[in-house]
Regions:
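Glycine-rich helix-loop-beta junction characteristic of Rossmann-like nucleotide cofactor-binding loops
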Residues: 87-95, 117-120
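Conserved SAM/SAH-binding beta-strand->alpha-helix loop
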Residues: 132
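S-adenosyl-L-methionine
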Residues: 143-164
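Class I SAM-dependent methyltransferase Rossmann-like catalytic core
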Residues: 46-90
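Conserved SAM-binding loop of SAM-dependent methyltransferases across substrates and taxa
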Residues: 106-121
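Conserved class I S-adenosyl-L-methionine
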Residues: 96-105
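N-terminal auxiliary segments of SAM/dcSAM-dependent transferases
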Residues: 2-52, 60
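Conserved SAM-binding loop
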Residues: 138-142
């Protein structure tokens, strides 16, 4: 596993096994942040709720369903691009690559890149970052399919303490 340093931040580490661990803010920090942000945004003249609060487990599942609709083309376009790059990309990579993904979700597109990385190197390190607990499920699924994969995930927003 990588030397991900646990700075003096308010994260709890969960070690699932030698190939999977993830970090997540302590529950009290999440609850306090939610209460503060909702209170602040609903006390403004123009009331709103930050969309990040839509991405709980159910919200993430709903978004994954939306991405497979015929009307939602970005995911299909991205997959098409990645498939076209599948044969050319390895010539630009060396044998010591890590993969960091912001907004990993169910890691559907990630698999296309992992297919390349795992053929190039004996061990692949993957760092998914997602606001939702879906990260844990998708990481466990990836480990079933990629023996040489090691995952260190972060369940948080991009502006979380771990990214400062």
């Amino acid at each position: 596993m990588s030397n991900f340093s646990e700075k003096k931040i308010d994260y709890k580490q969960y070690v699932i096994d030698s190939q999977l661990r993830y970090f997540k803010p302590h529950a009290t920090k999440i609850e306090k942040s939610f209460a503060e942000e909702i209170s602040y945004s609903l006390n403004q003249n123009s009331k709103s709720i930050n969309p990040k609060f839509f991405y709980d487990r159910k919200g993430s599942e709903l978004f994954e369903s939306i991405t497979s609709l015929p009307e939602y083309y970005p995911t299909r376009a991205e997959i098409s691009i990645l498939k076209k790059l599948k044969h050319d990309l390895p010539s630009y990579l060396d044998e010591n690559m890590n993969l960091v993904e912001l907004g990993s979700g169910a890691s559907v597109k990630t698999r296309l890149i992992l297919d390349i990385f795992t053929k190039l190197q004996a061990k692949t390190e993957y760092f998914p970052i997602d606001i939702s607990e879906i990260l844990t499920e998708s990481s466990e699924q990836l480990l079933k399919d990629y023996d040489s994969l090691h995952i260190t995930g972060i369940i948080d927003t991009y502006e979380g303490d771990g990214f400062k």
